[in-house]
Amino acid sequence: MAKRILITDDALFMRVTLKNILTQNGFEVVGEASNGREAVELYEKLKPDVVFMDITMPEMDGLAALKAIRSKDPNAYVVMCTAMGQKQIVLEAIQHGAKDFIVKPFQPERIVEAVQKAA
């Protein structure tokens, strides 16, 4: 069965790019969110297998959304996908339960690899 994925990024271009990579590789994108608040709401409704999460977004940033999702579902598989690759931010994301961290710009293979790691 194809992995069900939620994409969260405030940039439409990035959501479209991720969706194209994922669907071309046989994964199902079940939802898209443009901020962390939407991501938390859609996660509860859609129960995706994997969430791609940007960090810098309006209303609720990706780290706050990661914490909110993981507080409701400790097994949530969240992959941070952001241009912010500073060590402290990576560490904070991992400490709060992110399963992977991808720095933009990325190679499409890296996105596929992150989904394939999800059990």
Task: For every predicted segment, state its role.
Residues 46-52:
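Active-site beta3 strand of CheY-like receiver
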